Amino acid sequence: MTRQSDRLFKSIFTSMSLSLIVALLSTTIALLSARALVLADPFLRRLIRASLALPFIVPVMIFATGIHQKMIEWGLANKLSGIILVHLVYSLPYCAYLIFDAYQAVGIRHEEQAWLLGAKPYQAFIKVTLPLLSPVLFTALSMAYIVSFSQYFLTLMIGGGQVQTLMIWIFPYLQSNDRTLASNYALLFLGITLIVLAVFNGINYLLKRRYQAIDFY
């Protein structure tokens, strides 16, 4: 029982670490991409936005089967880094759409005003734009975390069962006839997710109080 508990706690830690890394990477990449797209040509902007929908069109099983061979060639199969990479493919579009729309609403006009007042570009971005985008950034962070945390097939296919996450642990019980145990693990999954989202929301609240962010929505 102790060994099983240790494996469970290890799978929880792996899931949370993996999902947090994916969420942070997705949000950062989406933020930088959104800034570039706001300043880009309208045709290029529409083309990139349309291409972001590809992960929603291609079924997960087809994508996982196709990318698995490449992961073996690249030496990323059965490794956490390979799972992070494929999770990014499915979490990044959510972040990109959310942050891009928010960045379009905010624009760079506030940064330009800060430049005129003597602020350096990086100072204007950190102290002006980021506080304005913080609600959407934490929404995107939460969405990416949920997408990664709930992935089963991609994790199983690319991880080869070597990387144990909470979903890999739970799924066999969901398929079994032991509904009581399956329900307990499902509640554990839900509880962990809610706690993490509450932490994200708390950090966002503290930042809003600090920067007195303006709500454009």
Q: What is the meaning of each model-derived region?
A:
Residues 100-109, 115, 121-128, 183-217:
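C-terminal transmembrane helix and the adjacent membrane-cytosol boundary/short C-terminal tail
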Residues 13, 17, 43-46, 106-139:
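Amphipathic cytosolic juxtamembrane alpha-helices at the membrane-cytosol interface
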Residues 1-2, 15, 36, 40, ...:
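Amphipathic alpha-helical segments that mediate coupling or scaffolding at interfaces
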Residues 1-7, 148-205, 217:
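Interhelical loop and adjacent transmembrane-helix boundary motif
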Residues 22, 29, 51-62, 82-100, ...:
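Faces of alpha-helical transmembrane segments in polytopic inner-membrane proteins
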Residues 44-46, 61-92, 122, 158-161:
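Membrane-interfacial helix termini and adjacent extracytoplasmic/periplasmic loops
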Residues 29-69, 111, 217:
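Cytoplasmic-entry segments and transmembrane alpha-helices of multi-pass inner-membrane transporters
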Residues 4-39:
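Transmembrane alpha-helix signature in integral membrane proteins
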